């Protein structure tokens, strides 16, 4: 009986501590610059197309996209961040594993490249605070 009680207690403790970690959202953020003659409206339009393409693919249904841009600028007014949010790192990884040439999102990438050049990216984990 004692080994069963210990096992149940450990499983409960693990679940209590693991659940919040598993629920953390992840953002993949690309630093981008508009190409000459392009606007943030153009960037939003291709971002919408990218999101539609991503959501049409396996594991992309729950992705979200946003464009972040500075409102006070000391450098380039054409800089913005392209942000893809996934409900978990596992969801992002499963989607990214299907990201290949010939997929809808790869075609959307080519259209995005006509509007902006993106150099480098970072992954961010969001941890809610209560």
Predicted regions and their residues:
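Acidic/histidine-rich, surface-exposed loop or edge segments in extracytoplasmic proteins
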Residues: 24-35
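N-terminal secretory/targeting leader peptides
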Residues: 68-73, 124-129
């Amino acid at each position: 009986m004692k080994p069963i009680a210990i096992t149940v207690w450990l499983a409960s403790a693990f679940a209590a501590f693991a659940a919040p970690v598993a629920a953390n959202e992840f953002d993949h953020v690309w630093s981008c610059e508009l190409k000459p003659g392009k606007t943030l409206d153009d960037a939003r339009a291709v971002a919408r197309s990218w999101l539609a393409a991503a959501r049409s693919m396996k594991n992309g249904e729950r992705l979200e996209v946003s464009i972040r841009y500075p409102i006070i600028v000391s450098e380039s007014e054409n800089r913005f961040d392209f942000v893809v949010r996934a409900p978990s790192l596992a969801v992002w990884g499963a989607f990214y594993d299907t990201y290949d040439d010939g997929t809808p999102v790869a075609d959307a990438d080519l259209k995005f490249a006509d509007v902006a050049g993106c150099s480098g990216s970072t992954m961010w984990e969001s941890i809610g605070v209560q």
